[in-house]
Amino acid sequence: MTSAMPSSDIVKNKPSSEHIDIVNEVELKPRYDEANLDKFGAVIEIDPVEKALVKKIDLYMMPILWLMYFLNFLDRNAMINGKLNGLDKDLNMKGTEYNTCVSIFFVGYLVGQVPSNMILNRVKPSWYMSGCMLAWAIVSIFPILAKDYHGMFACRFVLGIVEAPFYPGAIYMISQFYTRKEAATRMAVFYTGNLLASSFAGLIAAGVFAGLDGKHGMQGWKWLFLIQGVVTVGVALLAFFTLPNSPLQTRWLTPDERQLAHNRIAIDTTEKREGTNVWKGLREACFDYRLWLFALMGNLHLSANGFKNFMPSVVQTLGFSTTITLVLTCPPYLLAAFASVAVSWSSGYFNERTWHITISKAVAIVGFIIGTATLNVGARYFAMCLFVGAVYGVNNINLAWTAATVGQTNEKKTVAIAIVNTLGNLSFVYTPYLWPDTDKPRFPMAMWASVGFSAGTVVIAWTLRFILSRDNKKIRAANPDAVNFYVY
């Protein structure tokens, strides 16, 4: 949030009644122009100087984060498309061994997230995030050396550990540079890296399998791991020089822009407090019960997204060839990319969370029900487009909502984001077992479970709406002049 005065004055003017003076984490509260604030205290229209700053951050930070996430998801999902090229048979996998290799990734992924975000708050994010990317790039190539289930199991577990820092770290970086009204849209744009990777992964795999399978004695799925890993190494080296650290420590911002970037986020944070140490941030986050509701909502939401690790196999049940199957995985994710950005933009524009989650989940529920209720090919593919297209905006809204609600200090915010993402991704440890091959083609257990998970997400969202509305009343009672309130 900013005051109604020009943003350039916030930085350049001498102290006055409207001057915002922030030195590190020490903030002197400004006087607000309430005509330019919504009911939660967020600025409705920012001035041209601040708009230019936001565009600059969009141009410099978002593309590299997006590309990193695109490759992050391509690398972890190479195994999923590899199954269509005989990966599981080449490694002599039996029973649920393939499903276990899918899920073990998330065990490593979960173990690393909270410690990683605690470290992130005390090191240079540009170095840390880029270094982690270089590590996962190298590890993602190792599966070409796997000889059996045990080798792939080890590769997937280690890959989960080295990929763990990226997503929660990137979400934290976005929350450091964008206000409540801006963050969800940027997170949605960032998340399209995931969606477009899911969309085009099948096309990339189809091309690799068709052109390189058997070349130089290597199966197509091994070429897929190798090519994607090498590209990721190159992008990791680029990221070392382009990622920012914090608003006050960003090489491609001028000194005035750095101060403005810091000020606008500090003022936009409800019940902002001075920084603390990472252990106190961990304690404060863990004792804020609202965090656990956000975490539960994230877990239920992502539990309904278990299809993402089996989408090629689900589409395959429509009865088409391997190449056509891989091509047909593309449109649902393209639709999801568009819908995710649209829903998140709307959530930010109207500064509203609950109804956006409710409507998205209602559409997804319809898709899950159709998907298991019929064997008609057209209807089932429509259902896939429906539930894939509808669900992805919810995660962006939840994480942006978490950062805005449980982010009174940077240390608390980093831990909160990591905990919500960790417990959310815990779902991917057990949801693979909801999609056994024996349930083809309807996958009734997975589809009906997803209906229940989606309904639970809506219940938690409305519970949070009630709680935050009550918290806002407490803020008004304690300070009748308060203008900054929790969004719901």
Which residues does each PLM region occupy?
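Extracellular/periplasmic helix-loop-helix junction of adjacent transmembrane segments
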Residues: 80-112
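Conserved MFS/SLC helix-loop-helix module at the cytosolic interface between two early adjacent transmembrane helices
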Residues: 110-150
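Structural signature of the two symmetry-related core transmembrane helices
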Residues: 127-141, 355-370
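Glycine-rich segments within core transmembrane alpha-helices of 12-TM secondary carriers
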Residues: 184-218, 225-232, 417-431
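Intracellular terminal tails of multi-pass secondary transporters
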Residues: 1-71, 77, 95, 240-275, ...
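Helix-breaking motifs and short loop linkers at transmembrane-helix boundaries and internal kinks
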Residues: 75, 91-92, 115, 123-124, ...
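Extracytoplasmic gate region of multi-pass secondary transporters
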Residues: 80, 280-345, 355, 399, ...
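Helix-to-loop junctions at the C-terminal end of transmembrane segments
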Residues: 111-124, 338-352
